[in-house]
């Protein structure tokens, strides 16, 4: 005799859901903006650039810049810590920001000349090299 086989139970039909739940409606973009996140991000970046170009306030925060200026001063004076006037630090920060803005403008023009939109370190290096020793700080 062979192995015994069990009787099969009749299967009860399983309940299936009628249909999948409808997806939640996506919010429609207002004022005709593109629904793609990349295009939206690009527009917000361009808007931020335009607003920052119109402003005249300082973009670097004062306390980190003051700490950096004092740290560099201590390095060049062999440990002697000088007292800085607030106006002197403000003038130094204005000059540093003007230098950086001008450098990045030139570097971005070089990247556009190369047919790119992305700014690479080699663009900044070339801008400093073209400026020379006086304007490029060596």
Curated annotation (Swiss-Prot):
Protein keywords: ADP-ribosylation, Centromere, Chromosome, DNA-binding, Methylation, Nucleosome core, Nucleus, Phosphoprotein
Sites bearing Phosphoserine, chain numbering: 19
Cellular compartments per GO CC: chromosome, centromeric region; nucleosome; nucleus
Subcellular location: Nucleus; Chromosome, Centromere
GO molecular function: DNA binding; protein heterodimerization activity; structural constituent of chromatin
Chain intervals for the UniProt region annotation (H3-like): 39-138
Post-translational modification: Trimethylated by NTMT1 at the N-terminal glycine after cleavage of Met-1. Methylation is low before incorporation into nucleosomes and increases with cell cycle progression, with the highest levels in mitotic nucleosomes. Poly-ADP-ribosylated by PARP1.
One Pfam family per UniProt: Histone
Free-text function comment from the UniProt entry: Histone H3-like nucleosomal protein that is specifically found in centromeric nucleosomes. Replaces conventional H3 in the nucleosome core of centromeric chromatin that serves as an assembly site for the inner kinetochore. The presence of CENPA subtly modifies the nucleosome structure and the way DNA is wrapped around the nucleosome and gives rise to protruding DNA ends that are less well-ordered and rigid compared to nucleosomes containing histone H3. May serve as an epigenetic mark that propagates centromere identity through replication and cell division.
Quaternary structure note: Component of centromeric nucleosomes, where DNA is wrapped around a histone octamer core. The octamer contains two molecules each of H2A, H2B, CENPA and H4 assembled in one CENPA-H4 heterotetramer and two H2A-H2B heterodimers. CENPA modulates the DNA-binding characteristics of nucleosomes so that protruding DNA ends have higher flexibility than in nucleosomes containing conventional histone H3. Inhibits binding of histone H1 to nucleosomes, since histone H1 binds preferentially to rigid DNA linkers that protrude from nucleosomes.
Domain notes for this protein: The CATD (CENPA targeting domain) region is responsible for the more compact structure of nucleosomes containing CENPA. It is necessary and sufficient to mediate the localization into centromeres.
Protein name per UniProt: Histone H3-like centromeric protein A
Species of origin: Bos taurus
Taxonomic placement: Eukaryota, Metazoa, Chordata, Craniata, Vertebrata
